[in-house]
């Protein structure tokens, strides 16, 4: 427990300490955010705010882990997944900055790159970490075995595709208001810190805890009005840690509950697109759903805090489901 707290504290301290200098560095090189014209009008004043803040979070994470983490396959596996997802996000951010446009990588190309991350995660999980090809469903006494040999590996790979690509994209969609994705991600990762600790996966608990510390440090600058945005670098990194934590703790089926807010945000976009294509009408004033509430007149801070409360409720429910259906049954 001491190592978890120490890692989080170091990550927080380093992120806060380096924040101002990193923001000035981004401003000097004009690495600013380009805001979509079709977005809320209140967001137009955010144009030019430094982006790629996920790099700052990762510096805090690395610093925290350098102090307390132990080198082993589990640690390296999680860090490789995080580095790979963050790398895709960084490339996307760079495309936006270099092209001076709010659109980065195409959805198809980003999916392809994240699919390659899944292949990497698949190899690390099955070959080096020893993750089994079974799925634990809360409330059921028997595990769901995906199948023997090649069939099992194939089905497990499909599951990992849904977990990693789905989670990273859902967190990315949530990153639309100052502090929203960071705060919600921190809450979900705090839950996984506790789960990993109870599972005696202490190295994973240290990584999740350090990421929470880095996120809190990032919120020092990302809270409204934000001085820096995390960009895809940060949102995909958070999604990467969440995905890895779910896979290693065998709580893939609980991830949609623990990260419930991200699911709601992603569903709001899918519902909006499908209904509009079928009926030419919109369910929400604007998607993702946090912009809908902005259009209703809610202040940005109010939307963010209320969504944090919703995410806290989901994470608490997910932890209780884990504790009573999975942990207590062992």
UniProtKB/Swiss-Prot annotation:
What PROSITE patterns has UniProt attached to this entry?
A: MRAY_1, MRAY_2
Q: Which InterPro entries match?
A: Glycosyl_transferase_4, PNAcMuramoyl-5peptid_Trfase, PNAcMuramoyl-5peptid_Trfase_CS
A Pfam family assignment? Glycos_transf_4
Transmembrane region(s): 3-23, 49-69, 71-91, 111-131, 145-165, 179-199, 204-224, 228-248, 256-276, 307-327
Q: Which CDD domains match?
A: GT_MraY (cd06852)
Catalysed reaction, written as an equation: UDP-N-acetyl-alpha-D-muramoyl-L-alanyl-gamma-D-glutamyl-meso-2,6-diaminopimeloyl-D-alanyl-D-alanine + di-trans,octa-cis-undecaprenyl phosphate = di-trans,octa-cis-undecaprenyl diphospho-N-acetyl-alpha-D-muramoyl-L-alanyl-D-glutamyl-meso-2,6-diaminopimeloyl-D-alanyl-D-alanine + UMP
Q: How does it sit in the bilayer? A: Multi-pass membrane protein
Instruction: Specify the pathway.
Output: Cell wall biogenesis; peptidoglycan biosynthesis
Q: Which UniProt keywords apply?
A: Cell cycle, Cell division, Cell membrane, Cell shape, Cell wall biogenesis/degradation, Magnesium, Membrane, Metal-binding, Peptidoglycan synthesis, Transferase, Transmembrane, Transmembrane helix
The enzyme's first-digit EC class, named in words, is transferase
BP GO annotations? cell division; cell wall organization; peptidoglycan biosynthetic process; regulation of cell shape
Q: Which GO terms describe its cellular component?
A: plasma membrane
Cofactor requirements of the protein: Mg(2+)
Q: GO terms for molecular function, please?
A: metal ion binding; phospho-N-acetylmuramoyl-pentapeptide-transferase activity; UDP-N-acetylmuramoyl-L-alanyl-D-glutamyl-meso-2,6-diaminopimelyl-D-alanyl-D-alanine:undecaprenyl-phosphate transferase activity
So what EC number does this one have?
2.7.8.13
Where does it localize?
Answer: Cell membrane
Q: Family assignment?
A: Belongs to the glycosyltransferase 4 family. MraY subfamily.
Function of this protein? Catalyzes the initial step of the lipid cycle reactions in the biosynthesis of the cell wall peptidoglycan: transfers peptidoglycan precursor phospho-MurNAc-pentapeptide from UDP-MurNAc-pentapeptide onto the lipid carrier undecaprenyl phosphate, yielding undecaprenyl-pyrophosphoryl-MurNAc-pentapeptide, known as lipid I.
Protein name in UniProt = Phospho-N-acetylmuramoyl-pentapeptide-transferase
């Amino acid at each position: 427990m001491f190592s978890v707290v120490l890692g989080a504290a170091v990550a927080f301290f380093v992120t806060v300490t380096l924040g101002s200098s990193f923001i000035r560095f981004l401003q000097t090189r004009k690495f600013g955010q380009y805001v979509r014209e079709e977005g809320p009008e209140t967001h137009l004043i955010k144009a030019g705010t430094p982006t790629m803040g996920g790099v700052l979070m990762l510096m805090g994470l690395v610093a925290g882990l350098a102090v307390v983490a132990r080198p082993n396959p589990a640690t390296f596996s999680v860090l490789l997944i995080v580095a790979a997802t963050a790398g895709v996000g960084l490339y996307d951010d760079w495309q936006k900055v270099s092209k001076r446009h709010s659109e980065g990588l195409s959805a198809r190309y980003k999916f392809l790159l994240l699919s390659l991350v899944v292949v990497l995660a698949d190899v690390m999980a099955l070959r080096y970490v020893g993750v089994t090809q079974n799925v634990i469903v809360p409330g059921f006494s028997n595990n769901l075995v995906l199948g023997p040999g090649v069939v099992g590996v194939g089905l497990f790979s499909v599951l990992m595709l849904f977990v990693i690509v789905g989670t990273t994209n859902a967190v990315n969609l949530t990153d639309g208001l100052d502090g929203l994705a960071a705060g919600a991600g921190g809450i979900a990762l705090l839950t996984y810190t506790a789960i990993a600790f109870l599972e005696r996966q202490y190295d994973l608990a240290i990584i999740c805890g350090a990421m929470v510390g880095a996120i809190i440090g990032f919120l020092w600058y990302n809270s409204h009005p934000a001085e820096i945005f995390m960009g895809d670098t940060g949102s995909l990194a958070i999604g990467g840690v969440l995905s890895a934590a779910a896979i290693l703790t065998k709580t893939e089926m609980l991830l949609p509950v623990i990260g419930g807010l991200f699911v709601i945000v992603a569903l709001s976009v899918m519902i909006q697109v499908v209904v509009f294509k079928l009926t030419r009408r919109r369910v929400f004033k604007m998607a993702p759903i946090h912009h809908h509430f902005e259009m209703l007149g809610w202040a940005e801070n109010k939307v963010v805090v209320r969504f944090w409360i919703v995410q806290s409720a989901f994470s608490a429910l997910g932890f209780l489901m884990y504790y009573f259906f999975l942990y207590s049954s062992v």
